[in-house]
């Protein structure tokens, strides 16, 4: 029966066994008392170590902020429970990350404004001086972890809450010095307000704006607009703080810089350089220094960045006006070939090389090379000929704008309605200004004078083998 404990009841109880149990009972009681005393002694040593660590933390917490940066204490507390060696990592001071860590560690818990003010005032007032012990030395019952170990000796197996915030305190309640001391977490985190701007070096601690808190907003000088605010996971915060203290500052939300809209510039308006890139963008107005060509409509102001590539002395120089009575002839950047042909047909002075046949919308190129030459002048292509012009006209066959009349040479016809044709060719009844040979005349200053030749005499060839052939001009060839 020696193997039975006092909690087990044997099947038969005899006098000898009862006497033996009576003799063994004090031994078991002494054994349990010894175990309890050892457990209490171990707990007291553990709590005493934590108390000493707490005093060390409280003394180091009074060091100015620009000295070093501390690792949050709950990390050290968890290390103390598991018996791992405690190391406080010292890193260069970063006020932005420290302020953001103080803000971010409080994010998962929702406090009213008054409660946070209470923690600020009480924790700030109870700070002892640097290098001095508090008036009431912490006892095993006053350590931050002691309330977790009063229930039973096996309280280490109970789940420990993440944060032990006394959120049940009313805002108007004051905490005396002799009562339960404020947790050292509040001494470091809640006594320093989270400022949206870093404090000035000359500003004293009492002069900073107190109780200014931000739950989830990052440290930016202006509130973000239109961004969703999310509370961060404490597990993620714990991992980032264990890994690196520099990663405690959460990145601010992505701010997309928007440039002020310049109403004098339209993104769909092609630049003047693109218009004159292939020398096709000659404007139809006599003053070619105004405006740019684009789809939506003309710009009704003088654009001094538009440079016309060629200016001839035959052009009539006009002062550019700020506003015009009507828009110039502008269709998709340049004059198209079918519009050029309509403009030639609309001018009766061109009837000697192009004219209507009188059968609907048919017209005939009486002198196709002259038409091609004028089209080359319009497009600044001196090598233009009828072969190239006819290849360009085939493009309009596919588009359904014109057709070649079968059986007749140099005869074409427009297949669209006449009113629609002229309305598209001449928008707002503005006739295009076509280039003529007057713009291509040769300036006398650009030629070399032949003053050393005498036009009155006849030049004879050096060899007299053949008779000269006089001409009317007096030259001999």
Curated annotation (Swiss-Prot):
GO terms for cellular component: chromatin; nucleus. This is ETS translocation variant 1. Residues 128-179 are annotated as: Disordered. Residues 335-415 bind DNA. Changing residue 216 to A: Loss of phosphorylation by RPS6KA5. There is a cross-link at residue 317 (Glycyl lysine isopeptide (Lys-Gly) (interchain with G-Cter in SUMO2)). Transcriptional activator that binds to DNA sequences containing the consensus pentanucleotide 5'-CGGA[AT]-3'. Required for olfactory dopaminergic neuron differentiation; may directly activate expression of tyrosine hydroxylase (TH). Very highly expressed in brain, highly expressed in testis, lung and heart, moderately in spleen, small intestine, pancreas and colon, weakly in liver, prostate and thymus, very weakly in skeletal muscle, kidney and ovary and not in placenta and peripheral blood leukocytes. SMART domains: ETS. InterPro entries: Ets_dom, ETS_fam, ETS_PEA3_N, WH-like_DNA-bd_sf, WH_DNA-bd_sf. Its main location: nucleus.
């Amino acid at each position: 029966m020696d193997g039975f404990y006092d909690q087990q009841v044997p099947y038969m109880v005899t006098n000898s066994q009862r006497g033996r149990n009576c003799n063994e009972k004090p031994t078991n009681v002494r054994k349990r008392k010894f175990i309890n005393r050892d457990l209490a002694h171990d707990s007291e040593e553990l709590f005493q170590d934590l108390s000493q660590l707490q005093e060390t933390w409280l003394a180091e917490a009074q060091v100015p902020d620009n000295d070093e940066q501390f690792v949050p204490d709950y990390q050290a507390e968890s290390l103390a429970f598991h018996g791992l060696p405690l190391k406080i990592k010292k890193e260069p001071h970063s006020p932005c990350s420290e302020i953001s860590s103080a803000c971010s560690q409080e994010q998962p818990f929702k406090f009213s404004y008054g409660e946070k003010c209470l923690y600020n005032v009480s924790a700030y007032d109870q700070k002892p001086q640097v290098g001095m012990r508090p008036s009431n030395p912490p006892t095993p019952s006053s350590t931050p972890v002691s309330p977790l170990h009063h229930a039973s000796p096996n309280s280490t197996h109970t789940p420990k809450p993440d944060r032990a915030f006394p959120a049940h305190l009313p805002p108007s309640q004051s905490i005396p010095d002799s009562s339960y001391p404020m947790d050292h977490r509040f001494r470091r985190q809640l006594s320093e307000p989270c400022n949206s701007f870093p404090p000035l070096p000359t500003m004293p601690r009492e002069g900073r704006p107190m109780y200014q808190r931000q739950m989830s907003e990052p440290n930016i000088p202006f509130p973000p607009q239109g961004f969703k605010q999310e509370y961060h996971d404490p597990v993620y915060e714990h991992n980032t703080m264990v890994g690196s203290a520099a990663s405690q500052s959460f990145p601010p939300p992505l701010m997309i810089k928007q440039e002020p809209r310049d109403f004098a510039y339209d993104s769909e308006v092609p630049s003047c350089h693109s218009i004159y890139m292939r020398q096709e963008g000659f404007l139809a107005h006599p003053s070619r220094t105004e405006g740019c060509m684009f789809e939506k409509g003309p710009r009704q102001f003088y654009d001094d960045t538009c440079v016309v590539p060629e200016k001839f002395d035959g052009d009539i120089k006009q002062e550019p006006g700020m506003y015009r009575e009507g828009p110039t002839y502008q269709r998709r950047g340049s004059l198209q070939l079918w519009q050029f042909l309509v403009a030639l047909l609309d001018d009766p002075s061109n009837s000697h090389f192009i004219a209507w046949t009188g059968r609907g919308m048919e017209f005939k190129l009486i002198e196709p090379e002259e038409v091609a030459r004028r089209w080359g002048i319009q497009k600044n292509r001196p090598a233009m000929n009828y072969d190239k012009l006819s290849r360009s006209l085939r493009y309009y066959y596919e588009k359904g704008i014109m057709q070649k009349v079968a059986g007749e040479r140099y005869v074409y016809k427009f297949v669209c309605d006449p009113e629609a044709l002229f309305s598209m060719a001449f928008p707002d009844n503005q006739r295009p200004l076509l280039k003529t040979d007057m713009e291509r005349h040769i300036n006398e200053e650009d030629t070399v004078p032949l003053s050393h030749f005498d036009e009155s005499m006849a030049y004879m060839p050096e060899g007299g083998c053949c008779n000269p052939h006089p001409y009317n001009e007096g030259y001999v060839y």
